[in-house]
Design a protein with these regions (language model features):
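Long low-complexity intrinsically disordered regions
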Residues: 2-4, 173
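Amphipathic alpha-helical segments
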Residues: 23-146, 166-173
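Sec/Tat signal peptide C-region and signal peptidase I cleavage site
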Residues: 17-22
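A short, glycine/Asx- and small/polar-enriched loop/turn
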Residues: 152-155
Length: 173
């Protein structure tokens, strides 16, 4: 993807006969739009709260497992070796299950974050296309592909305002 962008830029600037002199090229900062749009902020807040809640839940479970382990260690000399082994294996299974659950929740939150990013990009595409056609713009580049540019050709704030009007929130459930 990175090489494709570089190739496009090289072709764009190496063959000026293919581009009219009145080409209107602008850029937007996609990262800023994703992070500062109302829908993006709401999605980030939702995911942050979900992660915080899940972390609290898992911390409580971890504390219970540690207490169970300490109890088992204190009972080691009291109970039979077979019973100790049996309880130790049960505790290990609980620990493994706990770790798997924690990983599944982390993966779920990551997937929801990616889904939110895709939904924002999907909503942004028609907005950009409409804005480009209304303002006779030839090309809009992402800020991270632009090395140096004048601030006058930055459409980020304008596009951000339009996106905030058209997209209030994102469904993550």
């Amino acid at each position: 993807m990175k090489y494709l962008r570089i190739l496009i830029l090289i072709l764009l600037f190496s063959s000026p006969q293919n581009i009219s002199l009145s080409a209107e090229i602008y850029f937007i900062d996609l990262k800023k739009i994703l992070n500062q749009s109302n829908a993006g902020k709401k999605a980030q807040e939702y995911l942050k709260n979900k992660l915080k809640d899940e972390t609290k839940k898992f911390d409580k479970e971890t504390a219970l497992l540690k207490k169970e382990e300490a109890d088992l260690i204190s009972q080691k000399k009291i109970i039979t070796p077979e019973e100790y082994k049996k309880k130790l294996n049960a505790l290990r299974k609980k620990n493994i299950s706990h770790q798997k659950s924690r990983q599944m929740v982390a993966n779920d939150i990551f997937k929801k974050k990616e889904m939110a990013r895709q939904q924002l990009n999907k909503a942004l595409q028609p907005i950009l296309e409409k804005y480009m056609s209304e303002n006779n713009i030839t090309m809009v580049l992402d800020r991270k592909t632009v090395v140096v540019a004048k601030t006058e050709i930055d459409l980020t704030d304008t596009v951000l305002k339009i996106l905030n009007k058209e997209l209030k929130s994102i469904k993550l459930n």
